[in-house]
UniProtKB/Swiss-Prot annotation:
CDD domains hit by this protein: Ribosomal_L25_TL5_CTC (cd00495)
CC annotations in GO: cytosolic large ribosomal subunit
Family: Belongs to the bacterial ribosomal protein bL25 family. CTC subfamily.
Region Disordered, annotated ranges: 185-207
Domain of life of the organism encoding this protein: Bacteria
Assigned keywords, A-Z: Ribonucleoprotein, Ribosomal protein, RNA-binding, rRNA-binding
Coiled-coil parts of chain: none
GO aspect biological process, one term: translation
Known function: This is one of the proteins that binds to the 5S RNA in the ribosome where it forms part of the central protuberance.
Listed InterPro entries: Rbsml_bL25/Gln-tRNA_synth_N, Ribosomal_bL25/Gln-tRNA_synth, Ribosomal_bL25_b-dom, Ribosomal_bL25_C, Ribosomal_bL25_long, Ribosomal_L25_dom, Ribosomal_uL5_bac-type, UreE_N
Keyword Signal: no
Name of the gene encoding the protein in the UniProt record: rplY
SUPFAM superfamilies linked: Ribosomal protein L25-like
Name the UniProt record assigns to this protein: Large ribosomal subunit protein bL25
Amino acid sequence: MSDENRLVAAVRTEFGKGAARRARRDGQVPAVLYGHGEDPRHLNVPSRDFAAILRAHGTNAILTLDIEGKEQVALTKSVVVHPIRNYIEHADLLVIKKGEKVTVDVPVVVTGEAAAGTLVAQDAATISLEADALHIPEQIEVSVEGLEVGTQILANQLELPKGSTLQADEELLIVNVVAAPTAADLEEETGEAAAEAEAPAEEGAES
């Protein structure tokens, strides 16, 4: 594990919303480390360093935690982000061991350009995989280069990295290539929307 994913974690001795707010004020993220039958450990990790790791490696980032001088490898299992202020409020971390398999949701990224006159609809933003805990793919790419109207890509058609297996429904729709709306279609939709908006106004005037 590279040093860039190393975090010095402090064991929490205070709990509750007030303690969590104080920790965040001090530049720390409250976190819980659990797994392998061990009692959950309540920690604080540096918010700036943790956020940088997530930006670089995604939400399934592997961490090397330094807890009171002892190292523990952990998977970032879930992260709660404030909906307005966009800071990390809390994180759940999972103890992992070398050679262990874990199930994770990995982002799906669409690449390439479909045929002219098409529109690419991405129906699934993530895909559930089982992968080696220390070799989780950051993303799964699916190419739509040159695809024609009517083409669909299902989960079982994705190219997965070696050691990863699909856990999602094999028939899960990932990408659907449809006909792009024409100028006439857009004009018709605009006209219908305007007519719908005028109807309530006319009804109100009559009453």
